[in-house]
Amino acid sequence: FEGNRATGVEVQSGDEIFGVESEEIILSAGGIGSPQILMLSGVGPADHLKEMGIPVQLDSPGVGQNLRDHPNVRVPVRVKDDFPLDPEAPRSQLALRYTAAGSSDRNDMQILASSFSSPMGGDPAAGEGIRFTCVLELAVGAGEVKLASTDPDVQPFLDYRYLDEPWDRERLREGVRLCLKLLEHDVYKDIVEGLISPTPQDLVSDDTLDQWLLRNVTTTQHISGTCKMGPDSDPMAVLDQYCHVRGLEGLRVVDVSVLPDCIRANTNATTIMIAERVADWMS
């Protein structure tokens, strides 16, 4: 930085570290990497930067906040011996998109049907059965990204805060129950042997199912919103509508982190659109 203008980046290539300068810097490191790099550069919540021993270039409290994602849980089932489990075959070819009961947000839920399921954290080619994946497409809750170290090679701390909000738990809970109802259909009678998870004990009440949700909820890898754009009136808006970092010159963020909220779909196409739009402005 020279004053409040970004003038370049420090780059590591192999064992070599060098600087690259430009009239305008485009930061495009994703929903985790972009806020991390900004904070390591002194742009972020001042208290957190001081806590990490980083000189404050710009107090921007929204950097790393507003972490949005699509929380999901998996409902795996055992299959009968004659059902083919092929790890090489296409797995997810069918999805149900729907609006949760009582929701004012259209298409806020999704259920994916998969013809092959492997254990969480295990060998992806080891078949345990088939599964439904229940996805909350528009969560109310939001998390944060914070630095764990001043070393850029150390992954920052991710606090997703999944299902902190009762409405998020309610919708995902009912989504799981819809998965179980689908499994009662006649077409599954010759396929399904029984549930792997949740267990009958997990299904006793809303509270027991909520505990199962909290143990099993995971990311759909659509982390968004951690450098969100917004109007002047929003103190948590990191960027303006043209993706410029507010309070600085010569620096934009262009990736999924600019979204104010996670879209109700996979994020890849939208991220490409954002990049194409900014490229038009720069040309």
Question: Residue ranges of each PLM-predicted region?
Answer:
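Glycine-rich loop(s) and the adjacent beta-strand/alpha-helix scaffold that form part
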Residues: 2-87, 149-150
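FAD-dependent oxidoreductase catalytic-site/capping-region signature
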Residues: 7-8, 80-84, 91, 95-270, ...
